[in-house]
Amino acid sequence: MTDADTRTATTDWQAWQESWDRQQEWYMPDREERFRIMLDMVEAVVGTAPRVLDLACGTGSITARLLARFPDATSTGVDLDPALLAIAEGTFAGDDRVTLVTADLKDPDWPARLPYESYDAVLTATALHWLHREPLAELYGRLAGLVRDGGVFMNADHMIDETTPRINAAERAQRHARMEQARQSGVLGWTEWWQLAAKDPVLAGPTARRYEIYGDHADGDTPSVQWHARVLREKGFGEARPVWCSPSDTLLLAMK
């Protein structure tokens, strides 16, 4: 099946979105709260009709919630994953508020693929831990050039404080115990979800290409909140601090 066939196939894209949400919530039961606070801060800083870059957009989870809350917003989603982009393309087909771009964030020239030179807000969630610190720092420098003055960048992700190993171990044990209970009730984990996608007649091709790019999972990094805030300031943002956190994750906001 070609990419054109994927975009025009009759498929329940919303069902795939919901399946992705359930799989992600298995890891992050407070995922919706992160999104709510993220959009609260978008409204607080840049208003209700922002031009947004959904960075490493995946299926477009941020974009969907952005447009539901702010109908006058526009979103550019950028990702490299063919399968997740196929779901995003199917979901937002015909919506001229959404542009989807295929690009590798490790490519220094990826911003040239975007339809705009600047954005009010760049938003990302549970994605940039796939990058090691050096390419992530380089990415932060490029983002500083994309966010307009007074605009924001927000990253919701795993940010580990390595100075608190006992607290980290206790949190990790509790989280994994909860995840095991959920698995016994039939919740799909990461591997099972991708196995399901590989069997779908529409997503099988994009999923195969996805594995050619990434393998089973990328080997990334989870530096501390302090590291992220320091590097963002060094790369051109004026302010940076957490605006929400859970025992394992943080939503960090940087203002240009």
State where each predicted segment sits.
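Core SAM-dependent methyltransferase catalytic element
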Residues: K235-K256
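A conserved beta-strand element that flanks and buttresses the S-adenosyl-L-methionine
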Residues: L123
